[in-house]
UniProtKB/Swiss-Prot annotation:
InterPro entries with a match to the protein in the record: F-box-like_dom_sf, F-box/kelch-repeat_ARATH, F-box_dom, Kelch-typ_b-propeller
Keywords: Kelch repeat, Repeat
Cited Pfam families: F-box, Kelch_FKB95
Protein name listed in UniProt: F-box/kelch-repeat protein At3g06570
Ranges for domain F-box: 23-69
Coiled coil (residue ranges): none
CDD domains, A to Z: F-box_AtAFR-like
Kelch repeats mapped onto the chain: 140-183, 185-234, 236-281
Signal peptide range in chain numbering: none
Listed PANTHER family: F-BOX/KELCH-REPEAT PROTEIN SKIP4, GALACTOSE OXIDASE_KELCH REPEAT SUPERFAMILY PROTEIN
Length: 390
């Protein structure tokens, strides 16, 4: 990671957890056995394992490893965070430090930390990223167009943390918003008939991620005049919902009749709170220093209870991001670090919250851990947190 993202810190003496001779002995094992062992190593520790030797670094990004993980039932969620300081966009993934031989003072510090941190992955330097343009399908994170007119689609393969290009959109879109159902990405946005035209048209297209092809038949948008300008989308109970910024209400696409229908829901404006995430048809978002939930089946809102240990998270939704992390909520938030009364740096914190639905109207959370995970210049802002399956 570039040194510009972190202030200088004092170096500590750390005793290596494994000797070189032990590493050499391990590498002398049969390849199939090494593959079987490494496939069981949690993804959180892969960055540490990659330091053992060059062959291990190659193994950790190989298709054979992830096939072995799938066959042995060791697939898991891997958490990512995107931040931005225009025109600079950065991507990070959650990792965990290994157990180490520590001094007494470090033992005391360890009691305050669970060892989680954010490690950099290659940046999406070819295209900007926005909250509504990033979605996850399996082990891939898709970056679709963005807010500037673009037809570009790029994919971050979270197994190897490398970017590649995907089939382009049919037109150059602005105001893009995307959601996923059954490994298909539903994309809405707006396009101009030509470069000089000031008028924009609504556009709706679906990408099949299994075949990597866009649906050849255009979807009907004649009923949605200007409804896709700066919109947000979500799938609730199998319905593709679109909430326009400048129009009241929400529209849902009826695939059987190929038309859009108005729907009533109390979650409408919450779709513009960029902290929100969805877990099992329940929407969660940060609001006024709390984590709130919305259940469309009950058409009601509530607060997640039991989070006193976490303390007050920042009030502004721009300061918080949530993600579905293995069925739990991952929460990212930042706090400014005072530096001679000049706030030049932010500390990003992360927590994992397990959820328990005790009654239809009551959801409780249990804080499993929370840690400071990254220090960044104060100009950086959150884009989105999301999890892939690897």
């Amino acid at each position: 990671m570039s040194s510009m993202l972190s202030p200088p810190v004092k170096k500590r003496k750390i005793v290596a957890p494994q000797s070189q001779s032990a590493s050499a002995s391990f590498q002398s094992l049969p390849d199939d056995l090494i593959l079987s062992i490494v496939a069981r190593v949690p993804r959180l520790y892969h960055r540490t394992v990659s330091l053992v030797c060059k062959s291990f670094r190659s193994l950790l990004v190989s298709p054979e490893l992830y096939k072995a993980r799938s066959v042995s039932g060791h697939t898991e969620s891997c958490l990512y965070l995107s931040i931005a300081c225009y025109p600079d966009y950065r991507m990070f993934t959650l990792c965990r430090k290994p157990d180490q031989t520590l001094t007494t003072s470090e033992e005391e510090e360890k009691k305050k930390s669970n060892g989680y941190y954010l490690a950099p992955v290659p940046d999406p330097d070819s295209h900007p990223v926005y909250f509504s343009s990033l979605v996850t399908v399996g082990s891939d994170i898709y970056n679709i167009a963005g807010s500037h007119a673009s037809s570009n689609v790029s994919i971050l393969d979270c197994r190897s943390n490398t970017w590649r290009e995907a089939p382009r959109l049919g037109v150059e879109l602005t105001s893009v918003s995307a959601s996923v159902l059954d490994r298909k990405i539903f994309v809405v946005g707006m396009y101009a008939d030509d470069e000089e035209s000031e008028s924009k048209n609504d556009f709706f297209e679906v990408l099949d991620t299994e075949t990597h092809t866009w649906d050849p038949q255009p979807f009907n948008c004649s009923e949605t005049k200007d409804k896709f300008l700066n919109c947000r989308t979500a799938f609730i109970d199998g319905k593709f919902l679109v909430k326009p910024w400048i129009h009241r209400g929400v529209v849902a696409y009826n695939s059987k009749e190929s038309r859009w229908e108005p729907v009533q829901t109390k979650m409408a404006m919450s779709m513009f709170n960029d902290s929100y995430c969805q877990i099992h048809n329940v929407i969660y978002l940060a609001f006024d220093g709390r984590i709130r939930w919305y259940d469309d089946a009950l058409n009601c809102w509530g607060d997640v209870q039991g989070l006193l240990e976490l303390g007050n998270i920042p009030h502004g939704p721009s300061c918080v991001r949530l993600a579905d992390y293995r069925g739990n909520i991952a929460v990212f938030w930042f706090r400014y670090l005072p530096d001679n009364d000049d706030y030049k740096w932010k500390m990003i914190w992360c927590a994992e919250i397990a959820l328990e639905r005790r009654t239809s109207w009551e959801i409780w959370g249990k804080v499993l851990w929370f840690d400071p995970v990254l220090t960044v210049p104060a100009d950086y802002e959150f884009v989105k947190a999301l999890a892939a399956t690897v």
